[in-house]
């Protein structure tokens, strides 16, 4: 079943507070991880107009591109490399206001100027970006 997001323009905090329960409802009855990642990425992109939003999955000890919204992205990222690999290694959110100032930044797109990487960790998987 298709869903329609209902987000009023406001400050980011209000928009997140409105969006989160809608995402929970959207993915609540779906058991397929890939389908849920696809809808979460689409909801974030649609609501906030981010340049790129998406996920990477850990497969064979590297990050492999998963559902995303935005321009073409790097397909594989090594553990501890770039912003995503570093966030995975350190198991923490990393906010990079200027990607040119991040040591070892991987330029998947020259148009990307900043990044926020949030590791999403479950019992058997780590999903990023």
Regions found by a protein language model. Name each.
Residues 90, 123-124:
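Residue-level recognition of short loop/turn positions
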Residues 50, 112-115:
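Short coil/loop residues immediately preceding or within conserved phosphate-binding loops
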Residues 1-66:
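Intrinsically disordered, low-complexity terminal regulatory regions
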Residues 126-129:
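Conserved small/polar residues in nucleotide/adenosyl-binding loops
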